[in-house]
Amino acid sequence: FNVDVEHVDQSEIIRLAADVPQAKVESAFNWLTENIGHIHYDGKQLTPEKLQTQIRATYAMKRIIEDYRLDFSGIKAQPELTNNFCTMDVTEAFLNDPYDWDGPHEPHVCATEADMDAALTMQIFKHLAHTPVLFADVRHYHADLGIWDLVNSGEHATYFAGASFDPKDNLPLVHFYPEGFYFPAGGASVHHLAHPGKATFARLTRRNGTYWMAILTGEFVQYDADKNMALMKQTDLAWPHAFTRFDCSVDEFMATYASNHIHAVYGNWVNELCQVAELLGIEAHVYG
């Protein structure tokens, strides 16, 4: 696709994080304290100091993006950063968001696990919809409800909590939970539940080395508070969730969908994605 790739060692995040002025860190920390719905400090995995480290990491990534003129990015994180520094959840969420503690900004696509095909798919979605793009694991199917729970460790932009460009609409619905045993370095996991609405889902993937694009429609759904909580606890409560009903059968989806990651924006973008695939000279497979 004629995309140049810059490989930047993630030790640069640690180096640059140390140079962030404490005054900037404290200002961001105060903004999060005032605006996030609830921060669940536990004195171990999530402390004010660890949250401030995540803020420093965010400024470090902003510096890398600026210095290398990156249009979009990804962070490997596991296991070096997540074992020994902090998780990148806060960084990834607010890069993908249309705002942070410094004010409004254009969403910068940042894929967790340095998933390059995720970043490519998300960048296409961003140019089409001009909104943040969901990055999620295809985690669990609730057969009794006919819904998928799309979950990721903290990558979901907080935009999806309220589907608004105004942080005052979204952030009261967001919780910062302590990271679990997967990530011993700790930090905050950015928890919320995707706002209901019709959505389009897609993923660039490969078959025998050749790219193709999976495309499907569906909707994000919610239930009453008790049921939402019970469902989220069946996977990982601390992580962000998107309860999703696809417009295709489980069998059709499972037969050919070729990734554990999936991406989405609100609205119907099937025709536009098919046109993009045609321009790129790749197959578009529309489910349903």
Stretch-by-stretch model annotation:
Residues 178-288:
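Extended hydrophobic packing segments that form well-structured cores
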Residues 27-30, 94-98, 156-159, 227, ...:
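Short, surface-exposed linear patches
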Residues 78-80, 140, 165, 269-270:
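Short, glycine-/Ser/Thr-/acidic-enriched flexible segments
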Residues 1-131:
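Conserved, well-structured core segments that form the ligand-binding/active-site neighborhood
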Residues 1-13, 153-157, 167-168, 173, ...:
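Solvent-exposed, charged interface segments at domain starts and junctions
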Residues 5, 133-135, 284-286:
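Short secondary-structure junctions
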Residues 110-116, 120-227:
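Long, charge-rich C-terminal accessory regions
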